[in-house]
Amino acid sequence: MTIGLVYAMPGEIETLLTDETRTPIRTEAGVSFYQIRPHTIACCCGVSKVNAAMGAQLLISLYHPDLVLNAGVAGCFENVPIGTIVLAEGFVQHDVDTTAIGDPVGLVSTVNQIRFPTADLPAAKAAMDATGVPYRTGWVATGDWFATDTPRSHWIADTFHPLLCEMEGCAVAQVCLRNGVKFMAIKSVSDCLFEHHDFAFNSPAAMKDLNRVVMAFLTQLTKE
């Protein structure tokens, strides 16, 4: 199985890289690709939906992965410890709004979907269980907006009922759907939206164990 990993920020991918893998094997359109291990390629694409979609499509077109996994940090709508690991059940895009022409909010008309579930959730949960790492499962809201404790955050929570909010995941999910590639995601909580946590201060703590969990998860998922 060939696996592709999509990260947004250098800080998210940093702990995945070693002296042997730190040099990109190629860079296309500003997206750097790294050979993490045999049959595992990672890319760092930049923050936001367009960057995430571009990185995911390049990854798929260049390396033809069987599975794409998006990993990174996210804000949480619940008050949970920083660094809590979340296995995503699926994604929505909170900033897609064509209600003016009669569509339900969040509808991506190209694929006629609001909700983008991740692939093989029972197998993913079994793999995560086998790592022994405590984790949550939940839905994730994606949009080109850094979430804070504002009326919009409350609207997202009330409308889509997600556990997390971030800026890339659903874009990757949509690209995978259109390419017929399986998609999964693992997130680490960097801040709690209604608790006024400092994202910049907490991000290193959120990223600290993320890639240890990602690699343990993939090892379990790909066991024969």
Question: Residues of each region from the PLM?
Answer:
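N-terminal short beta-loop-beta anion/metal-coordinating cradle
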Residues: 1-63
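Short, well-ordered amphipathic alpha-helical segments that serve as non-catalytic structural scaffolds
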Residues: 55, 59, 122-124, 207-217
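A C-terminal functional module that forms or caps the active site or interfaces directly
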Residues: 146-194
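His/Asp/Glu-rich mid-to-C-terminal helical/loop segments that flank catalytic regions of hydrolases
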Residues: 193-224
